[in-house]
Amino acid sequence: MTVKVKLKIILLSCLLLPLVLIAQDETSKKKALNIFTLGDSNGTFPQSWPKQLQTALPNATVFNISKSGRTIGFLNLGDSSLNSLFVIDENLKKAAEATKDRPFDYIVIDLGTNDGKAVFANRQGEVPQNLERLIQKIKSSPYPAVNNAKIIVISPTPYGTKAEATEKYKGGNKRVKKMSKAFKKVAKRTGCLFVNGYKTPGLNIETMTADGLHLDAEGSRLLIEPVLSLMVK
């Protein structure tokens, strides 16, 4: 084979590669994935990240159990139903009953924002421990449709200046920033996949939230881009 022919083959490969990747991406998006999402208020709105997952993966089934005010393991606002550790058994049962014999492919956890509130400032060492306990509860659940799913942990997005200007969330940005590092270690230790929500590419917490916390549609879409990459690769 001459050098000229080799160069033509290389050039043709370079031209065709983007088309192949596009075709693979479209095929991946057609996957009929079964996804269980667990989050806080950012998972409850019409433009929420679970909704964005459903839009991006139209053939997927997304079973969402998110709730405003939810924490990983703290009693928030005096409401025990907001403590994920306290209600995880009940929620896993709901998920298993909803999916029946069809196993979940992925469980996506996006929690921690409320664990970073000022009222919990002196208990931050408990947050990664609680996350690990939550993951272990999921992995050891009695429901085969749940306990064999791949788990994706998303660390919290930043706190914006509007949120930090309130007593309720004062100093929270530093706390959730630390969570991203701690959650990555927990994910690795427990065999989970990890997405650094604090460093979401393109996310501007000041312009993509009205209050420094709750993501608009654009922010929610950016948050799930790395999640999609893990699911469809």
Predicted segment positions?
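Conserved SGNH/GDSL esterase-like catalytic core that processes O-acyl groups on lipids
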Residues: 28-37, 42-132
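Alpha-helical transmembrane segments and their juxtamembrane interfaces
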Residues: 16-18, 50, 226
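Short hydrophobic "helix-edge" motifs at membrane interfaces and signal-peptide entry regions
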Residues: 9, 30-31, 206-207
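Bacterial Sec-dependent N-terminal signal peptides
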Residues: 1-26
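Alpha-helical cap/lid subdomain in secreted, periplasmic
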Residues: 3, 25, 89-233
